[in-house]
């Protein structure tokens, strides 16, 4: 029900790209809805996430279709308006076709004229999970935007990476690698 009542606060067609931290549905589940709304950019993800997404999104779409069919039968019995699907399995297939898998620690030029770069690092959460680093130059200075959806418990996977950003050039980290 909630999906039919809410809408995005932006136009999905205005988005140039998506960066997926990992394939769990709370991070990827609305991709088909974004596609249905006009998104057609790249979905950057790791190879592991690209392999999990078909299972996750198709399963979610199947559950959504089943629940919608049940809800529409209930609505029909009460004389209420039937709900149209807000996305379809075709939207899932389109979203999957927009996925652009990137290897861990591979700097990939992105954006107009490749003026930014994307690098994924293993987040240790699930297969394919990533800490995402986007580097770009602004006013002659290189800047880095780093984010992650979830981090795993194995400290060794991300401590040295995070240490660089908290204390660049300290005794634990001689500076950016």
Short names for language-model regions:
Residues 1-13, 94-156:
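Core dinuclear metal-dependent hydrolase active-site scaffold
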Residues 1-41, 45-95, 99, 151-157:
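Pre-active-site segment of Zn-dependent metallo-hydrolases
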Residues 22-23, 53, 125, 150, ...:
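Divalent metal-coordination and catalytic microenvironments
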Residues 27-28, 129, 168:
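Short, well-ordered alpha-helical microsegments
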Residues 48-49, 123, 164-165:
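An acidic- and aromatic-residue-enriched active-site/binding cleft used to recognize and process polar
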Residues 90, 112, 167-170:
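Intrinsically disordered, low-complexity polyampholyte segments enriched for Lys and acidic residues
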Residues 154, 161-166, 172-177:
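Cationic, amphipathic, low-complexity alpha-helical segments enriched
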């Amino acid at each position: 029900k909630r999906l039919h009542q809410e809408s995005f606060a932006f136009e999905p067609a205005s988005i140039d790209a998506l960066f997926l931290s990992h394939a769990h549905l709370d991070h990827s589940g609305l991709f088909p809805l974004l596609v249905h709304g006009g998104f057609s950019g790249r979905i950057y993800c790791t190879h592991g996430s690209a392999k999990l997404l078909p299972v996750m999104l198709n399963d979610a779409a199947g559950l959504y279709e089943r629940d919608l069919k049940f809800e529409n039968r209930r609505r029909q019995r009460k004389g209420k308006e039937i709900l149209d699907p807000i996305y379809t399995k075709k939207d899932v297939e389109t979203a999957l076709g927009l996925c652009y898998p990137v290897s861990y620690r591979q700097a990939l030029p992105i954006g107009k004229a490749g003026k930014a770069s994307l690098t994924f690092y293993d987040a240790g959460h699930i297969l394919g999970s990533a800490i995402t680093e986007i580097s770009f130059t602004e006013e002659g200075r290189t800047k880095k935007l780093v984010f992650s959806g979830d981090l795993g418990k194995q400290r060794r996977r991300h401590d040295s990476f995070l240490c660089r950003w908290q204390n660049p050039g300290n005794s634990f980290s001689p500076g950016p690698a």
